[in-house]
Amino acid sequence: MQVDLNCDLGEAFGNYSFGGDHQIIPLITSANIACGFHAGDENVMNETVKLAKEHGVGIGAHPGFHDLQGFGRRNIDMAPDEIYTLVAYQLGALSAFSRIHDVKINHVKPHGALYNMGARDKDIAHAIAQAVYDVDPSLILVGLSNTLLISEAEAVGLKTASEVFADRRYESNGQLVSRKESDAVISDTEAAINQVVKMVKDNKVTAKDGTEIDIQADTICVHGDGAHALEFVSKIRERLTKEGISITKLGG
């Protein structure tokens, strides 16, 4: 049994520091690197690609809406062709730095509102998937388990990775509880670890209302901007190892 452990990184920009990338990156197997729209900038992207390469961590593009103020977590009404170019543009930006450092981009994971809209809306999901395929059909598209983003990616011919969240609660339909709700984020380390182990070993998660739902766990996300991110990653890794679960980057 194996699983990938990923984290959203490279989200600082300009004079604003963000997250504990240098402490977290040795503990993960895949990094989702912000591409300058919801967070990150050219200097941070360059440094984060370099850092990921140094630690043998899989490099992923993390495209989002052009929304620094809202950190890419606000829904923006865009046509599918606009979503397509939005994603392709950001993949191009990260590709430049991957070439500079002679390392290949391994995967793509949309950020925030774009990720959630792609999980629910078939046209948006298709636009994201088609953009990724047209830029590089060998890339793995990461999406919320059992959602339209995964099925549309498979339909266009992409490899996929179904993602689960260590630090988020679930609705009974498999969607994430909205961050607007006070209990959307799990701050208790033990609760997060127990949720992860159940998802990976049993392919089940307990929803907010107590419902047991099926879930596919190819990769586990811990948010790099979370207050407990470093503690979560460290202890989740330790527990998975004790459970005999191999932690391996996407694609092996």
From Swiss-Prot:
GO terms for molecular function: 5-oxoprolinase (ATP-hydrolyzing) activity; ATP binding. Transmembrane segments: none annotated. It catalyses: 5-oxo-L-proline + ATP + 2 H2O = L-glutamate + ADP + phosphate + H(+). Keywords: ATP-binding, Hydrolase, Nucleotide-binding. It holds the Pfam family LamB_YcsF. One of its GO terms (biological process) is carbohydrate metabolic process. The keyword Phosphoprotein does not apply. Its EC number is 3.5.2.9. Belongs to the LamB/PxpA family. Catalyzes the cleavage of 5-oxoproline to form L-glutamate coupled to the hydrolysis of ATP to ADP and inorganic phosphate. Forms a complex composed of PxpA, PxpB and PxpC. This is 5-oxoprolinase subunit A.
